[in-house]
Swiss-Prot record:
The gene is MT-CYB. The chain crosses the membrane at residues 1-21, 45-66, 81-101, 146-166, 194-214, 256-276, 288-308. Disulfide bonds: none annotated. The cytochrome bc1 complex contains 11 subunits: 3 respiratory subunits (MT-CYB, CYC1 and UQCRFS1), 2 core proteins (UQCRC1 and UQCRC2) and 6 low-molecular weight proteins (UQCRH/QCR6, UQCRB/QCR7, UQCRQ/QCR8, UQCR10/QCR9, UQCR11/QCR10 and a cleavage product of UQCRFS1). This cytochrome bc1 complex then forms a dimer. It comes from Corvus corax. Changing I70F: In strain: Isolate New Mexico-523. It is a multi-pass membrane protein. The keyword Isomerase does not apply. This is Cytochrome b. It is found in: Mitochondrion inner membrane. The lineage of its organism: Eukaryota, Metazoa, Chordata, Craniata, Vertebrata.
Length: 308
């Protein structure tokens, strides 16, 4: 899945650059510039749909990649793992600020709700939120800085990816048995490059199918309405890949408690290398750990379902 994530990143950066050429980061123009892109720019509709749904595939791949890493004990490569978690956090930040850019109803209210969470931080919270907004509400300054972040962060992700790979190459990658694989080493090209092409095809075909046949399947219809600070949508919810965290946030009545639980749900990944006590690396021969692992997977799926 690592190679697929690399492909996702490249695809997203290319489509994103093409979109940025036609996008206007201004509250009065953002929504219309996106509409103009889909109507008047050559293949603009396709580029936009690939970019929007590419994010979903990025998250599918990263969640599978993390799950696979937990299952096979890859987190024992501590540096690689920790940089991976930082990569996940950066990706989540990028996806969040990107979702705000079309400036539809859900963009605006999503930005309002999520940035507001920073006000739960004791003492500095309120100042921090006003500093983040560039004013007393989500408005033009917020949109322009979010565009700047959304442009910058993917390159940060690309840089971190190289560091991630550098640390991985210190030890070599893990395998399903969790044992050294020195005797099985083979040249990357042509063997792995051909093997990866299969994965590329298996990811790109569903992505293109989704972008061409039902591009709005995963989006929120609320985002077809231009942002209106005076009308709150009936239900504010993020894209599906954040629903598990959003469900945790919403289920706790206390604001600070919810924010802490939301943060902890992702930051817990940093602790996993410290919690490993087994003599075996992988879960292949540990039925009890397997039960716990699949319970975790089921939990996340149920949270995602409940969150919607």
């Amino acid at each position: 899945f690592g190679s697929l994530l690399g492909l996702c990143l490249i695809t997203q950066i290319i489509t994103g650059l093409l979109l940025a050429m036609h996008y206007t980061a201004d509250t009065s123009l953002a929504f219309t510039s996106v509409a103009h892109m889909c109507r008047n720019v050559q293949f603009g509709w396709l580029i936009r749909n690939l970019h929007a749904n590419g994010a979903s595939f990025f998250f599918i791949c990263i969640y599978l990649h993390i799950g696979r890493g937990i299952y096979y004990g890859s987190y024992l490569n501590k540096e690689t793992w920790n940089i991976g978690v930082i990569l996940l956090l950066t990706l989540m930040a990028t996806a969040f600020v990107g979702y705000v850019l079309p400036w539809g109803q859900m963009s605006f209210w999503g930005a309002t709700v999520i940035t507001n969470l920073f006000s739960a931080i004791p003492y500095i919270g309120q100042t921090l939120v006003e500093w983040l907004w560039g004013g007393f509400s989500v408005d033009n300054p917020t949109l322009t800085r979010f565009f700047a972040f959304h442009f910058l962060l993917p390159f940060v992700i690309a840089g971190l990816t190289l560091v991630h790979l550098t640390f991985l190459h210190e030890t070599g990658s893990n395998n399903p048995l969790g044992i050294p694989s020195d005797c099985d080493k083979i040249p990357f090209h042509p063997y792995y490059s051909i093997k990866d092409l299969l994965g590329f095809a298996l990811m790109l075909i569903p992505l293109i199918t989704l972008a061409l046949f039902s591009p709005n399947l995963l989006g929120d219809p609320e985002n077809f309405t231009p942002a209106n600070p005076l009308a709150t949508p009936p239900h504010i919810k993020p894209e599906w890949y954040f629903l598990f965290a959003y469900a945790i946030l919403r289920s706790i009545p206390n604001k600070l408690g919810g924010v802490l639980a939301l943060a902890a749900s992702v930051l817990i990944l940093f602790l996993i290398p410290l919690l490993h006590v087994s003599k075996q690396r992988s879960m292949t021969f540990r039925p009890l750990s397997q039960i716990l692992f699949w319970t975790l997977v089921a939990d996340l799926l149920i949270l995602t379902w409940v969150g919607s």
